[in-house]
UniProtKB/Swiss-Prot annotation:
InterPro entries reported for this sequence: Sec61-beta/Sbh (IPR030671), SecG/Sec61-beta/Sbh (IPR016482)
Name of the featured protein: Protein transport protein Sec61 subunit beta
Quaternary structure annotation from Swiss-Prot or TrEMBL: Heterotrimeric complex composed of SEC61, SEB1 and SSS1.
Membrane protein topology class: Single-pass membrane protein
Organism of this sequence: Kluyveromyces lactis (strain ATCC 8585 / CBS 2359 / DSM 70799 / NBRC 1267 / NRRL Y-1140 / WM37) (Yeast)
GO cellular component: Sec61 translocon complex
Compartments where found: Endoplasmic reticulum membrane
Keywords in alphabetical order: Endoplasmic reticulum, Membrane, Protein transport, Translocation, Transmembrane, Transmembrane helix, Transport
Segments for region (Disordered): 1-41
Function text: Necessary for protein translocation in the endoplasmic reticulum.
Entry similarity comment: Belongs to the SEC61-beta family.
GO biological-process terms attached to the record: intracellular protein transport
Major subcellular location class: endoplasmic reticulum
Membrane-traversing stretches: 61-81
């Protein structure tokens, strides 16, 4: 019976280094969501959207106006349908 490490000394060293890296990474990760930066404020949500994202960039105020205009157009169409149904 041989008492040497399976795979040799290099494999043992690689295992030790991998374990040390794993422990170091575990120590660096925050333990709670608040430590991770998600403290319940809306600023943490805004960090998810960066300028590096591809696609159409639209100001939030423009989106708000378009949404309100859409709601008003639906209401106007309902009113027109009711009025035209009573006239004709």
């Amino acid at each position: 019976m041989d008492s040497s490490v399976p795979g040799g000394q290099r494999t043992l060293q690689k295992r030790r280094n991998a374990q040390l890296q794993k422990e170091k990474k575990a120590n660096q990760t925050p333990a709670s969501p608040r430590q991770a930066g998600f403290g319940g404020s809306s600023s943490s949500i805004l960090k998810l959207y960066t300028d590096e994202a591809n696609g159409l960039r639209v100001d939030p105020l423009v989106v708000l106006f378009l949404a309100v205009a859409f709601v008003f157009s639906v209401v106007a169409l309902h009113v027109v349908a009711k009025v035209s149904g009573k006239i004709f």
